[in-house]
From Swiss-Prot:
This is Regulatory protein CysR. Pfam families: HTH_Crp_2. GO terms for molecular function: DNA binding; DNA-binding transcription factor activity. Gene3D superfamilies: Winged helix-like DNA-binding domain superfamily/Winged helix DNA-binding domain. It is found in: Cytoplasm. Induction: By sulfur deprivation. Residues 120-196 form the HTH crp-type domain. Probably regulates the expression of genes from the sulfate permease complex. The gene is cysR. It comes from the Bacteria. The lineage of its organism: Bacteria, Bacillati, Cyanobacteriota, Cyanophyceae, Synechococcales.
Amino acid sequence: MVREPASTLLPPTSPATPAPHRLLIGRRGMVPTGANVIWKIQSGLVRSSTWGEEGDMISLGLWGPGDLIGRPLSCLDPYELECLTAVEVVAVSDPALESHESLVRSLRYTERLLSITRLRRAEAKLASLLGWIGERFGQPGATGWEIDLRRIPLTHQVIAELSGSTRVTTTRLLGEFRQAGRIHRRDRALIVRYPETLYPPARLSA
């Protein structure tokens, strides 16, 4: 069942605008997925997802400021855009004029995430996913990516759904990663250590 967006509509800049061009949506609200609307994220974190035949949610990606999202960019049905934080989005009338690079970047991020979920070993999937999230949303530190958990609320359930593993397996592996020093918490940040081959790595390019 599709949930209604918990959103606040701001007035359009011009009476000729056919639909609200800007939305403020609360955490756990849903970004509208109208057939012809593409949104550009101004702030916040959005998760795109669909549902399997047995009703299980399938995460498709995480999207942040500068990314383009919306029904025209997906061929899946159902297709949902859930706000993991408070989100501000603006409607893009012509994505080709707005930014061709944003579309290319979105496709590349999705491709990488899908390749991670196809890994067979749960440990490899989780390690690759944490690295992907670090490159995508973290800041490079002295020894690893620093992910601000106030801005990127990574619960065990969210991580499990993104990696395609169960929550029990994800929780167990996260504990093993902590014991091995591969991840650790500092204040409200999660530190994901760089792989030795990427120490220190260059930031992910679009």
